[in-house]
């Protein structure tokens, strides 16, 4: 008796490389942005040197475009070209030239109405919220899909799961505990 398990390959799903950096991490509680439905979200900063992940994302966007042609067409007579609709893969050098975290990188904003699974490098669930912050590195399981909402058309990125691989310098101006302690220690000696 054979145990034939066929893995279904979803061309619109991508698992990023381990050098993807997480920013604007909002993965513990859903938040509403501009009055919309509350969502979990993260900005994934992908080095341009990670050509494997970048190519997978481009292929998934293309697959989502073809899968969603009817949705993108809507009531119109034609499907708009992929080059003229909203694209989730964005160039950090062009869109965030003053932010060193985005230099030589692409970025994708991923979100979901359901909480992502979050695990460590050994695939154990992360339960301590402070372990996941803007600046950590890890893999992200994401999927791409077409949308057409009130004439606003494009490809969006859904957030499935996250795997933290390693810590990184916190982004967003939050000081590390080490630097805060050192500063306090120095200030105490200055006033003594």
Regions flagged by a language model, labelled:
Residues 36-38, 100-102, 136, 151-156:
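A short, structural micro-pattern
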Residues 1-107:
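OB-fold ssDNA-binding interfaces and closely related basic DNA-contact patches used
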Residues 122-138, 145-155:
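Exposed beta-sheet edge/beta-hairpin loop segments within beta-rich domains
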Residues 43-45, 109-111, 141-143, 163:
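Residue-level recognition of well-ordered beta-strand positions that form the cores
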Residues 184-191:
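Conserved small/polar residues in nucleotide/adenosyl-binding loops
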Residues 97-126:
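Short acidic, low-complexity segments enriched in Ser/Thr/Gly/Pro
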Residues 151-167:
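OB-fold/S1-family single-stranded nucleic acid-binding modules
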Residues 168-178:
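Short acidic, Gly/Pro-enriched loop/turn segments at secondary-structure junctions
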């Amino acid at each position: 008796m054979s145990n034939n398990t066929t893995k279904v390959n979803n061309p619109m799903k991508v698992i990023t490389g381990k050098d993807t950096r997480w920013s604007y991490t909002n993965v513990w509680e859903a938040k509403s942005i501009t009055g919309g439905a509350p969502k979990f979200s993260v900005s994934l900063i992908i080095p341009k040197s990670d050509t494997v992940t970048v190519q997978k994302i481009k292929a998934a966007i293309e697959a989502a475009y073809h899968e969603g042609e009817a949705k993108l067409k809507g009531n119109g007579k034609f499907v708009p070209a992929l080059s003229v609709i909203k694209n989730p893969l964005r160039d950090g050098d062009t869109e965030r030239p003053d932010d060193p975290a985005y230099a030589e990188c692409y970025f994708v904003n991923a979100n979901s109405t359901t909480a992502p699974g979050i695990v460590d490098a050994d695939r154990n669930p992360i339960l301590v919220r402070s372990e996941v912050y803007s600046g950590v590195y890890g893999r992200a399981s994401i999927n791409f899909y077409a949308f057409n909402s009130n004439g606003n058309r494009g490809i969006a990125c859904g957030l499935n799961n996250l795997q933290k691989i390693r810590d990184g310098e916190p982004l967003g101006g939050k000081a590390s505990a080490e630097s805060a302690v050192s500063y306090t220690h120095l200030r105490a000696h200055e006033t003594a």
